[in-house]
Design a protein with these regions (language model features):
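Catalytic core of DAGKc-family lipid kinases
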Residues: 2-8, 13-14, 56-188
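Short, solvent-exposed coil/turn segments at beta-strand boundaries
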Residues: 34, 108-109, 163-164, 218-222
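Short hydrophobic alpha-helical segments that form membrane-spanning helices or hydrophobic packing faces
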Residues: 49-52, 74-76, 212
């Protein structure tokens, strides 16, 4: 019987062997290679962190997404099916189709679609500051952050695009190779000198701290995401 690993949510389905763990336990799961499918319950940041751990473990499994975040960019890009439809198909012995999703390294970090220290970083910082009360869940905090920052973005974006210390990578815009400090395609190693040994960087909606002044961004691998039940 195939083994399925569910991260961050307890799941049960007749005919399937599903083991549940928390995201923080992934690096220490015994016999991780025995799991053919990994269900990621969460948003884009959760996906990024799980893929980073799997990359370190050098384990490739088919990824099943159960998007519960605010944006769910990866899930929307691949139009992933409902989780219950997927589990039903697997329990019936069907072999669902998958699609490839590239991911990239930024020094020791991993990201799938977005990285930068421009308006994206400012937006995430402010949106997370608003994450309380009625704004805790949903997209309202992100919309408010855009409205609050719009005047700053309009004034500062042209200058940031011309700066060697600023950058923004958005992989889905692959038709644009490079425009100023904006990158839409990562096919080779990109080296960026931030001239600062302590930097906050936005990666797929997460804010991480990078303690190097030189950033090296490069293709790091691919994952297979289940796309049809």
């Amino acid at each position: 019987m195939m083994r399925i690993l569910s991260i961050n949510k307890t799941l049960h389905h007749d005919g399937l062997s599903i083991t549940t763990i928390q995201e923080s336990e992934l690096a220490t799961v015994p016999n991780i290679t025995e799991y053919s499918y990994i269900i990621i319950n969460g948003g884009d940041g959760t996906i990024r962190r799980v893929i980073k751990t799997l990359h370190t473990l050098e384990h490739t499994a088919i990824i099943i997404l159960n998007p519960t975040g605010s944006f769910n960019v990866i899930a929307k890009l691949h139009r992933v099916p409902k989780l219950q439809q997927v589990l039903l198909s697997l329990s019936q012995g069907k072999s669902p189709k998958t699609t490839r999703q590239s991911y990239y390294s930024l020094n020791e970090e991993i990201f799938l679609f977005s990285a930068g220290n421009m308006g994206d970083l400012q937006h995430i910082f402010l949106a997370e500051t608003l994450r309380f009360g009625i704004l805790k869940n949903g997209m309202a905090k992100y919309v408010l952050a855009v409205l609050f920052l719009l005047p700053v973005h309009l004034i500062m974006t042209p200058f940031m695009l011309l700066s060697k210390r600023k950058f923004f990578i958005f992989a889905p815009a692959g038709f644009i190779k490079k425009f100023g400090s904006f990158y839409g395609k990562v096919t080779d190693t990109i080296e960026i000198d931030l001239d600062n040994g302590y930097n906050h960087i936005e990666l797929d909606g997460d804010v991480v701290t990078v303690r190097q002044s030189i950033l090296k961004v490069a293709p790091a691998g691919t994952i297979h995401i289940l796309t049809t039940p």
